[in-house]
Every structure is written in structure tokens, then in C-alpha cells.
Amino acid sequence: MTAPARRLCHIAFHVPAGQPLARDLHRVFGFQPLAVREAGGWRQLALRSGDAVFLVNEGTGPQEPLYSLDPHHSVPSATNLCFDVEDVDGAARALAARGCIMPVPPTRVRDAQGTATYTVLSSPAGNLSLTLLQRAGYRGSFLPGFRPLPCTPGPGWVSHVDHLTLACTSGSSPMLMRWFHDCLGFHHLPLSPGEDPEMGLKVAAGSGRGGLRLTALQTPPNNTVPTLVLAESLPGLNSKQDQVEQFLTRHGGPGLQHVGLYTPNIIDASEGMAKAGCRLLTPPEAYYQQPGKEEQILAAGHKPGLLERQGILLDGDKDEFLLQVFTKSLFAEDTFFLELIQRQGATGFGQNNIRALWQSVQEEAARAQGA
């Protein structure tokens, strides 16, 4: 590995001036403003919930936004992942030797609280760039160059980022897996016993409807980097685009499709967000009528009717369960959504839940087209 990622620092978004993402993250999802920077046509606002930090880069300017890159993308998008590394200068030299493109060379930023060094790396995943950051000893609330904002306790719905899902073009997962392994130290995480890293996990959506190929990657256990999931479409007999293909079309290529946010209490979190205006996906009606589903929900210690009313999916067996709920797109262009996830011993991603999500998104798309 060339520049092993040790921790996810933040996820950055690029949106036009006036786009309400920052407002929604605060009012709807319970993220609290952390720090702000306004310079050169950019307004950069960092928001935090637990250990999850989102950086919203709003506007445009003659220079790059600090700690990020202007992707000059035509639609709002999650455009950057920032990782903590031990040695930015050494990482940049090693990555350049591998032929990687570094649009922003190692740059030092100082303020009264200390120093941070960063570089920005282009990735082979569409408009997604990667920031490598070294800030050991920095004493501020966020990063040099940002003005800290008054700290206000939030609802605590989200504790950290559980996983990141990239929507990829068909057949590109093996190449992306090798790139993230060689450059950042990610390695294959099997989602099923005996899984072939080159093939990933195939999840069929139903007869003739294609499905998904998922490949999960993780860093060594001593690092605090979320699981990275590569998702690509499997062709079906139906000629209609599925949601991965629709994302690629609307987004203009591969990119970060959704972020899984861990919540210690998915019932309270989803209820609170819904009351604040969050639009949650509705699972297929048949999901909760599956044979054994009620018993499974009861075995996990939950009430079937409550999960159904809030659209929460549950999968697992024995003492290992996974609960998930998904938002509708945060952007009108349908290029990004969020997931809430609570784990009761489960470490993977339930195949039944994946199928249910697949069907939910397809049904939502059909309703939107008919509106």
C-alpha cells in the first residue's frame, strides 16, 4: 500500500450557492454546525453529528476550496473523501511515483491552533477526489483556516459513518478494488462465505430484473475507516434502467451514491428525522408479509407494526440483526441519499434488505415518472 488511510476525517459535497443541503443536514438530520470559512466565492460549512463530519462547499471561485477540489460538476454531488494519513509528503511522493494525479500538491495551512498539511488525489471513480490530511497536534475544533462556531448539543441521532457506497460502471469493480488496495490500503471484505474478490456478491432483484454486484473493502482493524462498498448493475431482461444506471446517467458518471450513517437507536432517529421533514423510502408492502418476518422482528426485540410504519428493514438470524432505513434523494437531481443503520451483532449487509431497497427505489422511480 502507498498511503494507508487511518481514519475518515470528513465527507465533502459540492453544491451551487443557495442549495439547501447544509440547512437540511442541520434541521432535518441533526448535524450541528462546527466551523465555517468564507473566501474567494466559496462558503464552506462543516457540520458534525458524533464522529460523522460533512463539509458542504457551496458556490464557486477562481481557486480551489480549502482541503478539497472544485470538480466543476454539473449537478450537486458528494465529491470528496478526506482521510487521515501519517505522512502527507511521503504519501504524495509515493502516489506520484505510481502515476497518480495530484491536482493539489502538499499544502500547509496554519492558524493559532496549529498546522495541517494536505494533498488532493484524483480517483478513478468519476468526480470523486480524495484528500490526504495530516493534522497531528492541531488543537482547533475542525481545521486551520476555518472559524469555529458555537457548539450546540444535537439530538445524537448519528454516531459515525458506517459505510460509503460508490456507484460504478459495469465491470469496473475489480479495477477500483485494486486501486484502493494499492493506493490507500483497503482490502477485500467478503460479504458471503467463499466470495471471489473479482466477482463480489451478486444480489438478484428478481426474475428478469437484473440486480447488483457488491464488493466491500475495508482497512486494517486498528484503523477507523468506514467500509467502502462498490456497487454495479447486473443486466436484466427488462430494458428499463435500474437505480445504479439511473445514478450514472443523472450524475454524469460514477460517484458516491450514498453514505450509511450509524445510529444507536434507529427507531428514535428515523422518527425524529421524519418529524423534521425527512422523506424516507417506503419498502415494498410484501416485505413485512414475508413468511417468518414477524417472528424475526420479534426475535430481534422489536415490534413489527412499528418497523413497518417507519419503513425500517430488518435482516439477520440468531443473535445477529441489521436494521436499515433509507432516505429519498437529498438533491432534486437524484444523485445522493442517506441510510440509517443499526447493528445488533451483524457485521455485513443483509441480502434481503438489499433486495427490498432495490425494489423500493425502483417503485419510487416508477411513481415519480407517473407523476
Swiss-Prot record:
GO terms for cellular component: mitochondrion. It catalyses: 3-(4-hydroxyphenyl)pyruvate + O2 = (S)-4-hydroxymandelate + CO2. It is found in: Mitochondrion. Binds 1 Fe cation per subunit. GO terms for biological process: aromatic amino acid metabolic process. Coiled coil: none annotated. Its cofactor is Fe cation. Gene3D superfamilies: 2,3-Dihydroxybiphenyl 1,2-Dioxygenase, domain 1. The keyword Glycosyltransferase does not apply. Its EC number is 1.13.11.46. It is an enzyme of class 1 (oxidoreductase). Keywords: Dioxygenase, Iron, Metal-binding, Mitochondrion, Oxidoreductase, Repeat. One of its GO terms (molecular function) is metal ion binding. Residues 7-135, 160-328 form the VOC domain. The keyword NAD does not apply. Fe cation binds at H163, H258, E339. CDD domains: HPPD_C_like, HPPD_N_like. InterPro entries: 4OHPhenylPyrv_dOase, 4OHPhenylPyrv_dOase_C, 4OHPhenylPyrv_dOase_N, Glyas_Bleomycin-R_OHBP_Dase, VOC. Iron-dependent dioxygenase that catalyzes the conversion of 4-hydroxyphenylpyruvate (4-HPPA) to 4-hydroxymandelate (4-HMA) in the mitochondria, one of the steps in the biosynthesis of coenzyme Q10 from tyrosine. Belongs to the 4HPPD family. This is 4-hydroxyphenylpyruvate dioxygenase-like protein. It comes from Mus musculus (Mouse).
